[in-house]
Every structure is written in structure tokens, then in C-alpha cells.
């Protein structure tokens, strides 16, 4: 890969210099490690059952049900088996250069208040996973996917499927402390030598008046806190915000004057975009031509997308994952070409699931022949004309 931004991280004297790079001329091509540090039961029910959490809505309810010690053991077993070193070898062999790792604020265990229920012991496994990525030369985005109080309503990706309660000064402070802690880890652990981006918050509420303080208070505080832990003279981490296309306001509007090394993320799931006609031709056309970078938000990366159509058609003949592999291969190519043209690259949601459905699994899509083992081969695809 050519023309990387190469950042020499200032590590302790006992650690080797590490290099975190951000693809520039070569697109970011990657996957999410969904389900690793934040379990979403809908996409991994058999694993959830193995953990003893069957019937529970989220991590909070599972920990509360099992009790802390039993839950800690169950989650630590999960963290040790869901993503393994061989997964990163496969990613590298498939031409992927990036992983986005969703994490919850409870990984910094002193942020968890009495009456909150989350598993303990995750940091050891996060370091291990980042080390495996680094061994394969894979760039890492660390994301605050689940924030204190939950940033979205009734969604397991927040760790607690409840009414969004993140939008308070107290929880903003905890969220800021968490992303600063993540940033500090990257300078003090050799395993994190290819971590180059901190995502400050996944999928906040959109089109809601609560988010005004997200933009005016939380975003600038998070930016300043991350910059404050960076060593002087070192190249800075990229700090990533949900772009304005998400609908939570303009993230850069309240950042400090002269802010640097900021990137933006877009999530693009056509299955939930009711403005797009549900036809194969329209899905291909839209994927080829949709501009995913808002004005003033360069670079933007499409950090979540899939091959899943709307729920009401996904099992019909015209959208069957069994009989329509040719279409799904073309749609995969169209999205890749579109995201690499209108943005700076992408990370697919997700690497693996237990759904038995390659439309939600990059690993499964490669096995099914829908995603190629050589991504460069898509350059010759004529799907977008």
C-alpha cells in the first residue's frame, strides 16, 4: 500500500516504535469486529445462548441475570473465542487493511457506576486483538460504540436497551474520559501500534433536539481530551465523528479553531432507506452514484454497510441469498466502487455472525463467492459502467 500517513507513536522506553497509518491513495478496506466487545444478540443468538444469556436483551440484562462473577467468566470465554488470530490472517489474505472495533465505555471499569451491569476484564482481550491486527499490518479504528447512559433508544449496540440517557453533562464527562483513555492506551501498549483513529461516538440520536449539546459540548470536549493525552512532537491520532449525513448536526461546527486530523464516518444501509425503490437495478444504481461525503467533511469513510435488503423481501425469490448470488456479488462490487469513489473507503458490517447469512458476514460472503478474495479484481468490474 502506498502513501500512508505514518505516525511514530511515542511509547515507553521498553516498547518498540509503532506506526499507525491512514490509507490515502489506497482506499480503506475493512470490516467491523461486531459482536466481539459488544454483543448484539440478533446476529449471534447461538453464541449468546452458549454464554448463558439466551432470552436476555443486552449485556446489561445478561450480567444482571447471571451475577457479576459468572457473567465475567462467560464474557471472557466469549472474548477469547469469537475473534481469533486466524481471523486476522484471513482478513490479510483477503486484501483487507482495516478493522473497526466497537467498544463500550465499561471497558474502563472505573467509569461504571453502582447499579450499572457490565462485564469486566475486557482490556486484556482488546490488547490481544489489536496485537493480532498489528501483526498483519492492519490499521485499527477504536470506536466508542456504547456510551454512558446509552446514546440511542432501545438498541443492544449500546449495551443497555433503554431510553437514551447519554445527553447529560455527567455522561458527556464519562464519555470524554473514555475516549481519552482509549487514546492514551495507544501510546503505552505496543499491541496498539497500528491504532490510528479514535471514533468518539457511534450512531447518536438523529433529528432530535437533544443532540444540539452533543455538537456544542461533547464533540469539542472529546477532541480536546484526546489531543491532551498525545505526546508533544508526535503525530496525532485521527479523531472521527459521525458525519452530518447521519442527521445529528455538523460535528465540526463547534470544534476548536484550527482543528486537525479529523475524519468522518457514514453508515449506509439501503435496507432502511425508504427513498430508494426496492429493486435490484435501483440498489445497484444508487450504490454506484450516491455521494457519501458531505461538504467540508473530507475524509469520510463508510464504516458500516451490508448486503441485507429490507426484512419483508429478504427471503423472497427475487432477493434470496441462495438463488441471487450473482446479484449480491454485483451489489457488493457496486457498493465498493461507490464508496471508494465518493468516500475514502469502507468497513463492512460485520466480519462474522451466526445467522448463516453472508449478507451480514464478510467471512461468509467470501466463502459464498459473493465477495472476492482479491478486492483489486473489482477494478475491472463494469457494474457501475
What are the functions of these language-model segments?
Residues 1-21:
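Fungal secretory targeting signals
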Residues 16-41:
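N-terminal module-boundary/linker segments of secreted carbohydrate-active enzymes
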Residues 29-33, 99-101, 140-144, 198, ...:
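Hydrophobic faces of well-ordered beta-strands that scaffold small-molecule active sites
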Residues 39-120, 346:
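Active-site-adjacent substrate/metal-binding segments within catalytic domains
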Residues 73-99, 113-146, 157-197, 225:
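An active-site-proximal structural segment forming one wall of the substrate-binding cleft
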Residues 135-137, 233, 342:
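Helix C-cap/helix->beta junction micro-motif
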Residues 190, 197, 201-340:
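Extracellular glycoside hydrolase catalytic/binding regions
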Residues 318-322, 327-334, 338-385:
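Aromatic-rich peripheral "rim/lid" segments of glycoside hydrolase catalytic domains that contact
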Amino acid at each position: 500500500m502506498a502513501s500512508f500517513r505514518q505516525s511514530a507513536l511515542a511509547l515507553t522506553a521498553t516498547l518498540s516504535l509503532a506506526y499507525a497509518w491512514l490509507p490515502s491513495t489506497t482506499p480503506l478496506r475493512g470490516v467491523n469486529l461486531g459482536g466481539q466487545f459488544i454483543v448484539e444478540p440478533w446476529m449471534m443468538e447461538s453464541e449468546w445462548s452458549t454464554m448463558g444469556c439466551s432470552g436476555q436483551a443486552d449485556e446489561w440484562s445478561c450480567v444482571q441475570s447471571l451475577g457479576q462473577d459468572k457473567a465475567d467468566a462467560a464474557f471472557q470465554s466469549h472474548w477469547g473465542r469469537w475473534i481469533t488470530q486466524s481471523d486476522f490472517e484471513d482478513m490479510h489474505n483477503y486484501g483487507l487493511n482495516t478493522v473497526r472495533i466497537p467498544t463500550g465505555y465499561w471497558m474502563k471499569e472505573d467509569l461504571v457506576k453502582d447499579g450499572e451491569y457490565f462485564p469486566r476484564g475486557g482490556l486484556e482481550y482488546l490488547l490481544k486483538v489489536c496485537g493480532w491486527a498489528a501483526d498483519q499490518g492492519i490499521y485499527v479504528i477504536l470506536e466508542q460504540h456504547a456510551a454512558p447512559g446509552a446514546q440511542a433508544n432501545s438498541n443492544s449496540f449500546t449495551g443497555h436497551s433503554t431510553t437514551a440517557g447519554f445527553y447529560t453533562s455527567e455522561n458527556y464527562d464519562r464519555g470524554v474520559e473514555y475516549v481519552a483513555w482509549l487514546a492514551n492506551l495507544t501510546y503505552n501498549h505496543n499491541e496498539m501500534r497500528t491504532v490510528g483513529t479514535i471514533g468518539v461516538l457511534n450512531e447518536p440520536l438523529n433529528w432530535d433536539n437533544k443532540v444540539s449539546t452533543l455538537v456544542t459540548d461533547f464533540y469539542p470536549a472529546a477532541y480536546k481530551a484526546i489531543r491532551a493525552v498525545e505526546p508533544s512532537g508526535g503525530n496525532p491520532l485521527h479523531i472521527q465523528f459521525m458525519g452530518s449525513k447521519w442527521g445529528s448536526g455538523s460535528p465540526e461546527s463547534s470544534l476548536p479553531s484550527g482543528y486537525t486530523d479529523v475524519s468522518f464516518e457514514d453508515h449506509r444501509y439501503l435496507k432502511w432507506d425508504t427513498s430508494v425503490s426496492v429493486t435490484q437495478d435501483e440498489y445497484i444504481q444508487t450504490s454506484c452514484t450516491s455521494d457519501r461525503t458531505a461538504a467540508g467533511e473530507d475524509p469520510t469513510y463508510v464504516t458500516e454497510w451490508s448486503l441485507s435488503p429490507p426484512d419483508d423481501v429478504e427471503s423472497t425469490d427475487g432477493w434470496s441469498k441462495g438463488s441471487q448470488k450473482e446479484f449480491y456479488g454485483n451489489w457488493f462490487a457496486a457498493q465498493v466502487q461507490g464508496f471508494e469513489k465518493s468516500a475514502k473507503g469502507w468497513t463492512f458490517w460485520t466480519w462474522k455472525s451466526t445467522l448463516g447469512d453472508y449478507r451480514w458476514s464478510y467471512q461468509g460472503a467470501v466463502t459464498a463467492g459473493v465477495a472476492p478474495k482479491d478486492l483489486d479484481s473489482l477494478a475491472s468490474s463494469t457494474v457501475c459502467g
